[in-house]
Curated annotation (Swiss-Prot):
InterPro entries: Aminotrans_II_pyridoxalP_BS, Aminotransferase_I/II_large, HisP_aminotrans, HistidinolP_aminotransfase, PyrdxlP-dep_Trfase, PyrdxlP-dep_Trfase_major, PyrdxlP-dep_Trfase_small. The lineage of its organism: Bacteria, Pseudomonadati, Pseudomonadota, Gammaproteobacteria, Pseudomonadales. The modification N6-(pyridoxal phosphate)lysine is found at K230. This is Histidinol-phosphate aminotransferase 2. The keyword Amino-acid biosynthesis applies. HAMAP family: HisC_aminotrans_2 (MF_01023). Pfam families: Aminotran_1_2. Its EC number is 2.6.1.9. It is an enzyme of class 2 (transferase). NCBIfam families: hisC. The keyword Amino-acid biosynthesis applies. Pathway: Amino-acid biosynthesis; L-histidine biosynthesis; L-histidine from 5-phospho-alpha-D-ribose 1-diphosphate: step 7/9. One of its GO terms (biological process) is L-histidine biosynthetic process. Homodimer.
Length: 370
């Protein structure tokens, strides 16, 4: 006789739906029985430029030490991040991707009877980490596909411990300005930790999108999370970080798994931070690709949501799921976002020029026969 181990799980976990990543290239290749090299994947907001050459060299140099555990404190990377970000080293928390930082926050500050506030159309990990610890999710309706910060303020109550906001937001690409952010932070109660998710901040340099680091000193209840998975091109290595007060960083460190960032990731991240030419080329490629996709959508008579990320959400004016499936048959992987409350949209990662062209041609072909 065996127990019902689903029923024995925590109530919040019982109701969870696992995170579904973008469809892997190899999986589609098996399904279609085609060469993986012929498939274009624009689904997971990865950097089409590939990894920094300096990061690859750092990984090669680290291979001889694979029998050793990594530096559990990540001293070299934390020191470099502290210098670059203008903070002290004890304000830096390293994570196995920035998702890890979000989960550490939930484990440390949320529990049954407490709640977290976040926006409609927000990153899927926010509800997952909230529900996993038995806390309540308070979802605030979006405004023009983005965060309605005044409405989010009104949703905060004495049981709120965390507010998740993203700038720019994924999957919509929307953003808010410095004045809006400052007014919001001024009014958030002191007992609420604001997690400002800046996974795509590197793509927004030179725009009107604010830098969360400019607000850290003034607001001790602010944590800024960032990642090396996007503009720095290290998605496979899983390394992210949080910047906060030393007290918050200490609390997160208490629930952090030992050796949560591996040696290859630590070495590659340090090298990637130093490769300013690579980052500049990533931004240039992204800006050109964004313009290419916008022009293509315009030619097809489609609307899209303006984006500050390395992706763009296009409105097909009809249910997107069948179009997504037809694109798969054309060997093109994009991201359906019905699970974000956007059933008529597809989210497209900015790719190389040839990849963008391949997608636009496939989309035109599919729409013509739909």
């Amino acid at each position: 006789m065996s127990g019902d181990f689903l029923a024995l799980a925590q109530p919040g976990v019982q109701q969870l739906s696992p995170y579904v990543p973008g469809k892997p290239v190899d999986e589609l290749a098996r399904e279609l029985d085609i060469d993986p090299a012929t498939i274009v994947k624009l689904a997971s907001n990865e950097n089409p430029l590939g990894a920094s050459p300096k990061a690859l060299a750092a990984i090669r140099d680290e291979l001889a030490e694979l029998t050793r555990y990594p530096d559990g404190n990540g001293f070299a990377l934390k020191s470099l991040l502290a210098e670059r970000c203008g903070v002290e080293i004890d304000q830096v928390t390293l994570g196995n991707g920035s998702n890890d930082i979000l989960e550490l926050v939930a484990r440390a500050y949320l529990a049954p009877g407490l709640n977290a506030v976040f926006s409609e159309h927000a990153f899927a990990v926010y509800p997952i980490v909230t529900q996993a610890v038995g806390a309540q999710a308070r979802v605030v309706p979006a405004k023009n596909w983005g965060h309605d910060l005044p409405a989010m303020l009104k949703a905060i109550d004495d049981r709120t411990r965390v507010v998740f906001i993203a700038n720019p937001n994924n999957p919509t690409g929307t953003w808010f300005g410095a004045e809006e952010l400052d007014e919001f932070l001024q009014d958030v109660p002191a007992h609420v930790l604001v997690v400002l998710d800046e996974a795509y901040i590197e793509y927004a340099e030179g725009s009107d999108l604010p830098d969360g680091l400019d607000f850290l000193a003034a607001y001790p209840n602010l944590l800024v999370s960032r990642t090396f998975s996007k503009a720095y091109g290290l998605a496979a290595l899983r390394v992210g970080y949080g910047l906060s007060t030393p007290v918050v960083a200490d609390v997160l460190n208490r629930v952090r798994q030992p050796f949560n960032v591996n040696s290859l990731a630590l070495a590659a991240a340090c090298a990637a931070l130093e490769d300013v030419d690579y980052l500049a080329e990533s931004r240039r490629l992204n800006e050109a690709g964004m313009q290419q996709l916008e022009a293509g959508f315009r030619d097809l008579g489609l609307r899209w949501i303006p984006s500050k990320g390395n992706f763009i959400a296009v409105d097909l004016g009809r249910e997107a799921a069948p179009i997504f499936q037809e694109l798969l048959r054309e060997g093109v992987i994009v991201r359906p976002v019905a699970n974000y409350g956007m059933p008529n949209h597809l989210r497209i990662t900015i790719g190389l020029p040839a990849e963008n062209t391949r997608f636009l041609e496939a989309l035109a072909k599919v729409l013509a026969r739909a």
